Amino acid sequence: FFYISEEGCESCYLPYLKRMNLLSQKYGADKVIVLAHFTDKRNLEYLFSNNQIDLNIYVLHTTLDLFPKYNFYPILFFLSKNRYIENAFVADKSNLDLIDSYLEVVEHRFLKIN
């Protein structure tokens, strides 16, 4: 899952959306889901269409409050079979190298079919 908020910085989460889009194209749309806290759906649709991003999107009417300090940051995470959040990662444009490493681990450990 990838959580974004309209109150977050678009330049902060757009690089990650593009990377997630590539993973979705490579492994299937059912493997990558975006949870978006946007009150104006038109802005969200424009963001995705303008950047050729084709991901499953679920619009949230509230923030996730997973990590209240980071409600407006993009957050990547897995949902376990028991519906627990696992391997959460708070993304920021200051940690591009870390996001690349995180997505590489995601791809190798969770997405590749053996």
Describe each PLM feature range.
Residues 46-79:
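Short, internal strand/loop/helix patches
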Residues 3-4, 35, 79:
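Short hydrophobic segments within beta-strands
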Residues 80-114:
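Thiol-/selenol-based redox modules, centered on thioredoxin-like
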